[in-house]
Amino acid sequence: MRLCKRCVMPEDFPHIKFDEKGICNLCREELSRGRMAELKKEYREKFLRRIKRGRGKGPYDILMCYSGGKDSTYTLQLLKDVYKLKILAFTFDNGFIPERTYINIRNVVEKLDIDHILFKPRFAGVLKKIFRKAASASLYPPKALERASAICTSCIGLVKYLSLKIAVEKEIPFVGFGWSPGQAPVTSSIMKLEPAMIRTMEGALKGPMKKIIGEDINTYFLEERHYARPDKFPCFVHPLGFSDYDEKKILARIKSLGWEKPYGVDLNATNCLLNSFADKTHISKYGFHPYLLEIAAFVRGGYMKRGEGLRHLPIKKNKKIVDAVRRKLGL
């Protein structure tokens, strides 16, 4: 299979076309480094203006979705030490958090002196059923599955809507995420949420889950009382989109907070043992790695060399971890 000579995109990925030099259309459309620097500055200043307007208006300035991974840990530190925000950290336990990640989370929130809540949905009656179905069925639109597996899409979808519920109820003006520059473009790094848009997006996610577990899924999504408070809908923000990103420097910085890489996690998810299994099922169903778009964007953006990018896209996974996940899911 041919790969783009500049990034790592394969020729059989949806909507990818190579020119006569073997360069993919995504690389040809990539913004110049200079223009990207301008956009980052623009969105960083936009965030600072919004902070100035929203700071101190509620019990917290921002609800940070904190997975315990390297990127969300670094984002948490940025929000506290650089932007000086009052933070409520929110961790969603999907049943596959490594023991070391629990230790990392405790170390970091204590070191940064941040309030923290952990939410663990029922596993047997909710998460297990959703993950089992997502392993075999597509569930979501093809466009969504180009960027993440159905399992990961389910998980992050629950995180988004639970965090949104908390933010509306507690009148917190921002919800933060640790998305890397490869996961989402800088132009979406600050997004004011509109109820009509959220309701439409909610249906695309909630509908498939409702078919799996029934009315119980309503617990994890918005109610009419939330939609009745449009002025309390927060901004979603992922600061790494407009920040300098250097993985080696990030790892060195968070090490000082008591963070260590857990055993058994792969290169793309330093907080979740389910990820390797999710990747494996996605590759077997669709023929491409679910992290392709993210890693290719990293390479194009200069955050990662092409050879390193290819190492982040392994087809073979840790069999011991994958088998353990299968057993827990009853597959």
Regions found by a protein language model. Name each.
Residues 74-75:
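Hydrophobic positions on the alpha1 helix immediately C-terminal to the Walker A/P-loop
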Residues 62-71:
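Short, glycine-rich nucleotide/cofactor-binding loops
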Residues 1-62, 78, 82-331:
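Nucleotide-activated chemistry modules centered on ATP-dependent adenylation/adenylyltransferase
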